[in-house]
Amino acid sequence: MNAGVIIERGASPWQIFQQGPEGTAPIRLEGTYHLVRLSQELPLAFSQVPPAKAVIKARVALESTGESVIPWTECEIPSEGTWRVTFPAVPAGGLYRLETTMTYEGWDGLSCTRGDMVHHVGVGDVFVIAGQSNAAGRAKDPVADDPEPGVSVLRPSGRWDLASHPLGETTGAVYVGHYENHNPGHSPWLHFAKRLKRELGYPIGLVPCAYGGAPLRWWNPEENGALTQNMLEMLGDYDIHPKAVLWVQGEAEGYENSAETYLDRFTAFVRAVREALGQPELPFLTVQINRCAETKDEALDRQWGIVREAQRMAAHVIPHVCCVPSADLALYDFIHNSAEG
């Protein structure tokens, strides 16, 4: 039974909106409204109210106190039974509650004025996670890394959620371009996001798009680029222009003997992503590959060394790319970083 104000589009529970340079983000809501009267006796019965002039209002409130951040704002009614509103400058922070209500001529105290709400919404920074298994998270050792309100994840299901390990698990997945064939484990990104949130004082969102075993050619549109297309689809569906790309990849190049061209191909990948998003200075925060402890293979070691050097050089020759080493991190197995790392 639809009664009162219904939110149909615009924001989801746990969603983090990327702030702009001014430290704010626009949030748009739209939906329908229904004039309904409740019976005076139980069990409740619902009956339609004759058409009347309705006023729909919405506000942004702090979830912790109920205090209005943006006060009740009258919504536009483009046609009878529909409404929409845009809050053009919701400040960085949260978590927020988006709330609606209605009034209308002839209200008698029993007719519904209730409205839908969207809980746990924040404005802050959103990071997209790309690369292969050490970005996706494959280690399965125990990790003390609790979820924390204010850190959210856009799951492959297309739903925003409280961020928790494993970030990229595929329950109900609708974005299947990076559909893992087995369950991922933990990754460093939840810890990363919690640290950022505490230092910066506003929410952080994560969009995991990494795929285990992925060579660079699956990301580079000049070769294959299927994973980049999948990533852009996820970002586009939620109109996300991320704060930065978190990138851990390169292990596969050793097995494909393609390390010598890594720098040129990574440069092409970065350029393509920036052009597609219209963000020419989009930062890429990259992690050098660690090591492989499976076998003693001098050819593989050489390939990995070339990749590491290419990753180091990328931070010098591509603007807004930075690189951190990982060779001192402990391994969970022959190739994946452990919880200790």
Give the predicted meaning of each segment.
Residues 1-341:
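Cell-envelope and extracellular/periplasmic
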